[in-house]
């Protein structure tokens, strides 16, 4: 139908979501450039919003499935000019993947700095639209995030994003070591059993523990949530352990 045609491209969805959050056409133009490096004219943005606006609210509040196998929660950070002052802002996206591997954008939200309480509001929005149960929620490493998920969806498995974790781990690694450190860490999360993954982390510790003790500590302290995907069939694993599907 008409709505599907206009919501068919990811860019249209981003424009509509930003506009729906109360940003002006000029703000939307600036945000798209900042977030995606995309330059799009104010006229084109108006064209998209004018055509779809009557149905936008319907899209934002549309009923969702009661159950999803996997939901990804991710935030992008950028600065927005408000009353002449630049403020840090988080842009939240919520995606699902169904059993056929099809991806669906459930919601886009824009709201101040990222914080676990903001994510609580996002999760409550999903519940108010009919979501009752989620098998796995994939998240970044925000403090308090897991507790918020458990509060709203007590039986959901929390999977911390391996991509985010790798980024954090590699932050202070010397240039000359980067390739080898990344390869050795890859052995941890590509293991097919938890036992093999623990062995790979132990081997990493022997090789690099002295120089990069913080990496070993990071993985050990978050082990259960980083390795949650190992409890699922191999076909599902890669789909689970990253918030960047």
Language-model features, listed with the residues they occupy:
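Short, amphipathic alpha-helical "recognition" segments used to contact nucleic acids or chromatin
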Residues: 9-22
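Short acidic (Asp/Glu) and glycine-rich catalytic loops that position anionic groups and cofactors
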Residues: 101-102, 162, 180, 225-232
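DNA-recognition alpha helix
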Residues: 26-37
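A polyampholytic, Gly/Pro-enriched intrinsically disordered region
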Residues: 67, 176-195
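Conserved beta-strand -> loop -> alpha-helix junction used to position metal-binding or nucleic-acid-contacting
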Residues: 136-143, 148-184
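Acidic/histidine-rich catalytic cores and adjacent linkers
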Residues: 190-245
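RNase H-like nuclease fold core
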Residues: 1-6, 35-42, 47, 51-139, ...
